[in-house]
Design a protein with these regions (language model features):
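A surface-exposed beta-alpha-beta supersecondary segment
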Residues: 27-82
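Generic structural motif
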Residues: 59, 89, 196-198
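Alpha-helical transmembrane segments of multi-pass membrane proteins
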Residues: 10-25, 84-99, 119-142, 158-174
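Amphipathic alpha-helical interface segments within eukaryotic helical scaffold
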Residues: 65-110
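Juxtamembrane "helix-exit" motif on the non-cytosolic side of transmembrane helices
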Residues: 144-146
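Short C-terminal domain-edge/linker segments immediately following a structured domain
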Residues: 52-55, 86, 97, 115, ...
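Intrinsically disordered terminal tails
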Residues: 1-50, 105-116, 150, 154-159, ...
Length: 217
């Protein structure tokens, strides 16, 4: 797989992962809570779902949510998960912009390959930071919810967060490790061909040795 293809795949993976993190942050179906069986809880209207921003009651004829806006009394796992997920969503804007400008198909005026490489590395590091925030939040939240009240199953929002964090990790790793290195850029001048006026044939000798040879001819 060529470098351009790897970078494009890393960008697309990071973009889809960022969308997954946004969906997980905005929705409240992180965990499903119930003290009894699923059928019993639905009949008694005690089947609930909990997210970062609200706690809902779910039944066949009712879906009512209560906002979790009492910041001072909220558990630490909810407040920390909120902060990490919001930070991941915000960091997605500059990181994806950097990665997009580092793609080989995007050309900026008076831009060197070294500057493009540094931009790809910085964008990849920010995407890995997004992945770390998503992983910590989506792992800590269900553990905290289970300790606070009986956890029955995981919600769709939590799965979206897991998928988003995994895709961001994959995309960030590809952008950081597969975007080409400075060593390749440094080797480019030494691979040039020099031509002698007398022989007219290509010579791949280093510049200093080739010039010395032409001086003695």
């Amino acid at each position: 797989m060529s470098q351009s293809c790897r970078m494009f795949c890393g960008f697309m993976s990071s973009f889809v992962g960022w969308i997954g993190l946004i969906i997980a942050t905005a929705t409240n179906d992180w965990v499903i809570t119930c003290k009894y069986g699923m059928h019993t809880c639905k009949k008694m209207d005690e089947l609930g779902s909990k997210g970062l921003w609200a706690e809902c009651v779910v039944s066949t004829s009712l879906y009512h949510c209560t906002a979790l806006n009492q910041i001072l009394v909220l558990p630490a796992y909810i407040q920390t998960s909120r902060a990490l997920m919001v930070a991941a969503c915000i960091a997605g804007v500059p990181s994806l912009a950097l990665v997009m400008m580092a793609l080989p198909c995007v050309k900026l005026a008076n831009e060197t390959d070294e500057a493009k490489h540094k931009r790809a590395i910085l964008g990849g590091v920010l995407i890995l930071f997004m992945s770390l925030c998503g992983i910590v939040s989506t792992v800590w939240f269900p553990i905290g919810a289970h300790q606070e009240e009986h956890l029955m199953s995981f919600g769709l929002s939590l799965y979206a967060g897991w998928v988003g964090a995994a895709l961001c990790f994959l995309g960030g790793a590809m952008m950081t490790c597969c975007s080409g290195g400075g060593a390749e850029l440094q080797q480019q001048p030494h691979n040039r061909f020099y031509y002698s006026k007398h022989s007219g044939t290509a010579n791949s000798m280093p510049p200093a040795a080739n010039h010395a040879k032409n001086a003695h001819v």
